[in-house]
């Protein structure tokens, strides 16, 4: 059976299919983990430890070697994406209630959902698009984008906007596995290869555990809001990214469009933030479902928009 091949045809499938399977388990057999115990319970409830290993391996996979063009391009895109999410947090924090929108078609939208969906770029999608529609240097910009992985940037944004307060040690704890992996991977290429190969392998495991924190009814309730969030990510982050790429990064805007997506890893952010700041616990489940939908929407639409933009503004693709 070509199971992996079928999963790869679904945008973000490696993350979203196990996530959905986990949500199925949690909806119809919510006590399965405690009932089975042992290793099965670890797989079902082990989101945080599995993600900790994943962040370590992600750090180890990054090679600290880049040209000036790569650093300028990636730096511009990363800073612009984070700054945009921060502005959105400031505005949303002023107008949205702490527990998010509770009624109507946009029920579930919260500051946590908005920031988690917007502050992290799908680096793999970006690299693939820029390999096709840009240069090797532009494609290589995804290296710095990997630094967005994990809850750290979301913590910084929520803290800087005055929406949440985190103890200093929590920032250290959030980034330490990544930094240790990064250091080891750059000290020894063999370790980088060893741990880097595990990044993709671990995604279905933490996605399944994450899915076991979601009830399918929440996914159904937030369907339209999730689609709306995905479109919002493309428009709200895409416009500043295009302008930054053109006027600061020296590009034609294609890289900006390619970076206007939600990262698959962002699906785990609401739960991680709620684990550190309990005031977000009431909105974490809905935010997770919304961000998951946003990942699908942006994974489908961003390649199409990038191709159209490159055809219009890039001479070699005209």
UniProtKB/Swiss-Prot annotation:
Cellular localization per UniProt: Cell inner membrane
Molecular function per GO: 2-keto-3-deoxygluconate:proton symporter activity
Record's keyword annotation contains Transmembrane: yes
Protein keywords: Cell inner membrane, Cell membrane, Membrane, Sugar transport, Symport, Transmembrane, Transmembrane helix, Transport
Any one GO cellular component localisation term in the record: plasma membrane
Membrane topology: Multi-pass membrane protein
Keyword Transmembrane helix: yes
Residue stretches spanning the membrane: 10-30, 42-62, 76-96, 105-125, 139-159, 163-183, 199-219, 224-244, 263-283, 289-309
InterPro entries assigned: 2keto-3dGluconate_permease, 2keto-3dGluconate_permease_sub
Predominant place of localization: membrane
Reactions catalysed: 2-dehydro-3-deoxy-D-gluconate(in) + H(+)(in) = 2-dehydro-3-deoxy-D-gluconate(out) + H(+)(out)
Family listed: Belongs to the KdgT transporter family.
Protein's job: Catalyzes the proton-dependent uptake of 2-keto-3-deoxygluconate (KDG) into the cell.
Protein name: 2-keto-3-deoxygluconate permease
Organism listed in the record: Pectobacterium carotovorum subsp. carotovorum (Erwinia carotovora subsp. carotovora)
Lineage: Bacteria, Pseudomonadati, Pseudomonadota, Gammaproteobacteria, Enterobacterales
Name of the gene encoding the protein in the UniProt record: kdgT
